[in-house]
From Swiss-Prot:
This is Asparagine--tRNA ligase. PROSITE patterns: AA_TRNA_LIGASE_II (PS50862). Gene3D superfamilies: Bira Bifunctional Protein, Domain 2 (3.30.930.10), Nucleic acid-binding proteins (2.40.50.140). The keyword Disulfide bond does not apply. InterPro entries: Aa-tRNA-synt_II, aa-tRNA-synth_II, aa-tRNA-synth_II/BPL/LPL, Asn-tRNA-ligase, Asp/Asn-tRNA-synth_IIb, NA-bd_OB-fold, NA-bd_OB_tRNA. Belongs to the class-II aminoacyl-tRNA synthetase family. The keyword Magnesium does not apply. GO terms for biological process: asparaginyl-tRNA aminoacylation. It is found in: Cytoplasm. Its EC number is 6.1.1.22. The lineage of its organism: Bacteria, Thermotogati, Deinococcota, Deinococci, Deinococcales. One of its GO terms (molecular function) is ATP binding.
Length: 445
């Protein structure tokens, strides 16, 4: 029976067989050290010349990096070894021969080289750990919404209009007769689903033609977007908090090995796992930022010449970074000026200058991970907002239909998966949070 590396701790003192790839090797004299991976984890194997047939030892010496092999040996406890165990090899045989030299050697490589070799780099410890965390979070997303009674609802990738009223769209020529766009969001269609099922969520790729080279932006990323009808602004924020704290708890429960492999300080995630996220208004957030700037109490990656935000302007990345360092867990900033938010957001009945919306800012400078709002449910108000933004009414006629019949207050939000993965994993750039990033300067491999 073939064992896997992740379960070797359960077989200490037993003889097992592994099928694995060689990531690196070293040795001298009568011993060879083989570093192995099999997709489930990493382990070191030792081949002692006196314990094996001569051909086995010679075969071990001939192995090349990333060669696939089958090994049989005894699992031994060793606190010094990664994972607390190592394999003492008795038999070994290559599964196949390599036909080229593996380009990613154990020496240091620059990030651009590694991204050029992304199809191979995924085999290495760092991306392996990040992708395992991504898988864990994706499963947790589905589990959370299932436990809350949501229906998964698939929105189209082709749309005839810009849901956010922006020009950052990938245009598609439909057989020379009409134009369509790659979807920026599944929200509008999810609202239709909410009126049918009460609670729905979409989860899939999203496309934004942003000519940005920042560490927070991708042209193609994954987004989860729940919509609830009926619902309101406060209930929407409560849902966001339950959701994010659930994801962090799941990652801490299931991915300790991967997080420690990345050198992640797990204590930084404990507050997020507990919930109780602070909630401040946009106006209060501006004051927090202003005080930090005046006192020169700035995070290391924020330049000293950063300027305060004037009321009515959006928060920039440096301001979000300041707020993220001010709190020890995600902070929810609510009631932004309506003029800088999307047309479909419900105005605050107590102050029409602001919308019933919020952004969730991750700590440690990771910035916005969620944007949400109560949606306009009144037909006349929504129509006037569409016209005010200069958007074509005919493109939104079906969306207005949702307000013509059976409209109720409803709310939802969008969460960028890769931003959450970057934050939980503690990585600097969002490009590492997706298997094959698509950016302004990268379309391959």
């Amino acid at each position: 029976m073939i064992s896997n590396i992740r379960d070797l701790k359960q077989h200490v003192g037993e003889t097992v067989t592994l099928q694995a790839w060689l990531t690196d090797k070293s040795g001298k004299g009568k011993i060879q050290f083989l570093k192995l991976r099999d997709g489930s984890g990493f382990v070191q194997a030792t081949v002692f010349k006196n314990d094996v047939e001569e051909e086995v030892f010679e075969s071990a010496k001939r192995l090349t990096q990333e060669q696939a092999l089958t090994l049989t040996g005894e699992v031994r406890a060793d606190e010094r070894a990664p994972g607390g165990v190592e394999l003492s090899v008795r038999r070994l045989s290559p599964i196949s021969e390599n036909h080229a030299e593996y380009p990613i050697t154990p020496k240091e490589h620059g990030i651009e080289f590694l991204m050029d070799q992304r199809h191979l780099w995924l085999r290495h410890r760092r991306p392996w750990a990040i992708m395992r965390i991504r898988d864990c979070v994706q499963r947790a997303i589905v589990d959370f919404f299932h436990s809350e009674g949501f229906v998964r609802f698939d929105a189209p990738f082709f749309t005839p209009n810009a849901a956010e009223g922006t020009t950052e769209l990938f245009e598609i020529d439909l057989f020379g007769e009409d134009k369509a766009y790659l979807s920026q969001t599944g929200q509008l269609h999810a609202e239709a689903g909410a009126f049918a099922f009460g609670k729905v969520y979409t989860f899939g790729p999203t496309f934004r033609a942003e000519k940005s080279k920042t560490r927070r932006h991708l042209l193609e990323f994954w987004m989860v977007e729940p919509e609830v009808a009926p619902s309101n602004h406060k209930q929407n924020m409560d849902l966001q908090e339950r959701f994010v704290s659930f994801l962090v708890r799941r990652a801490l429960d299931e991915c300790t090995v991967e997080l420690e492999m990345l050198g992640r300080d797990l204590s930084k995630l404990k507050g997020a796992a507990e919930g109780n996220y602070p909630r401040v208004t946009y106006t209060e957030a501006l004051e927090i930022v202003r005080q930090h700037i005046e006192n020169k109490d700035l995070p290391p990656n924020v330049q000293e010449d950063v300027q305060p935000v004037e009321w009515g302007d959006d928060l920039g990345a440096p301001h979000e970074t300041i707020l993220g360092h001010h709190f020890d867990r995600p902070v929810m900033i609510e009631k932004y000026p309506a003029a800088i938010k999307a047309f479909y957001m419900q105005p605050d009945p107590e102050d029409s200058r602001v919308a019933l919306c919020d952004d969730m800012i991750a700590p440690e400078g990771y910035g916005e991970i969620i944007g949400g709002s109560e949606r306009i449910h009144d037909y006349d108000l929504l129509k006037s907002r569409i016209e005010h933004e200069g958007l074509p009414l005919e493109a939104f006629d079906w969306y207005l239909d949702l307000r013509r019949v059976g409209s109720v207050p409803h709310a939802g939000f969008g969460m960028g998966l890769e931003r959450v993965i970057a934050w939980i994993s503690g990585i600097d750039h969002i490009r590492e949070a997706i298997p094959f990033p698509r950016m302004l300067t990268r379309m391959r491999p």
